[in-house]
């Protein structure tokens, strides 16, 4: 029974907090607010009609780009290409290191195996250079 009391108490506390919170006031729909004068974030999203039409007049779809816009776009492309190149170079280096380590381990194992075979087959009666003729 004590856990139900804890749950009910926590729910009531949350409800009380949400009731008096300023976040809920800004999210609630009010009847007395005027739609003509937006406040807060709405003012940043919606602009007057004159500013919106000037924005589209200033830069249409077919208008040539300014030199600054072209330069900024080129800088973004160059930076992206550089990041891509660095990433691929890092991946290639990691793969080369892994392949080199694998080759070294394989060479070491084969060398040890060959040494063991030589020692096993050598009986001391003839020089070693006669083995593989």
Curated annotation (Swiss-Prot):
Residues 80-120 form a coiled coil. The keyword Secreted applies. GO terms for cellular component: extracellular matrix; extracellular region. Residues 87-115 are annotated as: Disordered. Keywords: Coiled coil, Extracellular matrix, Gamma-carboxyglutamic acid, Secreted, Signal, Sulfation. This is Unique cartilage matrix-associated protein. The lineage of its organism: Eukaryota, Metazoa, Chordata, Craniata, Vertebrata. GO terms for biological process: embryonic skeletal system development; regulation of osteoblast differentiation.
